[in-house]
Amino acid sequence: MAEKIFFDMQALNPHVKIVCGSFKPNGSSAVDNDDNTGAGWTVARGGVGIFTVTLGDTYPGILSATCSVALSAVADTKVQFGAIDVASAKTVVINVITTASAADIAANAANRIHFCLVLRNTDMTK
């Protein structure tokens, strides 16, 4: 379970933790984690259109997750979650798809992938 200091929030579920942020894709090159927003995670490019977010802590479960993409130019680009393992590997995969195929996003100051994870920091499932 997470051991970091978290700030107060209100939720109907007990022991909810939120980890969110954004990163700048860099075409076919590695992501520069110094440009990330948010705390408690890093990201690595794993192949064409594949980004693996690694959390700083494990969590017993995930309640919800969202991801989106911001681009400097209009494109038929979408992001979706792939494998999620917050309990042992501490990883969340984000896949990028442009016109139904895996694709990289060009390096551009305005191009960012955003995500928000609502995590369960207890073994209680409800």
Features from the language model and the residues they span:
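Terminal beta-strand-rich extracellular "head" domains
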Residues: 60-89
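Extracellular receptor-binding modules and their adjoining Ser/Thr/Gly/Asp/Asn-rich linkers
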Residues: 1-58, 100-126
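Short Gly/Ser/Thr-biased coil->beta-strand turn/linker motifs
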Residues: 3, 17, 76-79, 92-95
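Ser/Thr- and Asn-enriched, surface-exposed coil loops between beta-strands
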Residues: 47-49, 83-101
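N-terminal compositionally biased, intrinsically disordered segments and leader/signal-like regions
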Residues: 67, 78, 92, 99-100, ...
